[in-house]
Amino acid sequence: MPKSDQVLLDLNNPVFQEDLFSFGKEEAGRVFATLRELKRLSWSEVHRDKGLRWELVQSKRGPGGMRLYTIRITDKVRALVCRDDQFMRFLSLHRDHDSAYR
């Protein structure tokens, strides 16, 4: 059983999967390395990790009005995510960092 602050990943969003499968082998490998790292972290560690750059998206809301956030996945890719209790739900991946905020 995961500890109460443990990050659980939800990678089932079709848009996220489409984005992920569009990456080449090397870039996809870097994305998976970050996902493995995230799975080992607690939520408090995610918020403190300067490399991930957890940022609130002010310009839009997610499903059911949930707040949206971006995190740095690689030096070239950001993910749009929302937090749902222990789950970090991945909504999309963005090669252009600015597009994650639109």
Task: Specify the residue positions occupied by each region the protein language model found.
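Basic, Lys/Arg-enriched alpha-helical interface segments
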Residues: 1-77, 83-102
